[in-house]
Amino acid sequence: MIDIILTTNSPGEVASWVKPVVEKLNELNIEKNIYVFTPPCVFSSGNEGRVLSELNGITAAFNSRQYLKYILLNIKPDNFKPSKKGFILFLGGDFMHAVFLGKKLDYPVYAYTERDYGFPKSVKKYYLSDKKLYNKMTKDGI
């Protein structure tokens, strides 16, 4: 069993990035849990959890309150049962939340980004859609 933990926040990211990623992951013939954390974000609508719960293949989705309790107080959400093997995939929000989860679970962190990058020493690999950003990151030694 492998855990695939996605971090995202706003409705746009849930619709544009999480949904197609989950659909592709569902095509893989592997035993997996797909967990989605929606850390605190000023752009959050509050409806992300409901939308995520309607997506086929997501094992569980956690709101910002559950995320904070887990990160700060080590109180796991009831339906979060991490295995020994997994990874974090950043799909939006603040990079630090994906990094915190990666450190807590000892999972590598991967990130998809269109505009910036953060915590380069803590992110194993970046996935980019923009050649200009790739050139900037390369110039910066990332």
State where each predicted segment sits.
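Nucleotide-activated donor-dependent transferases that construct or modify glycoconjugates
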Residues: 1-11
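Active-site and donor-binding regions of nucleotide-sugar-utilizing enzymes
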Residues: 11-142
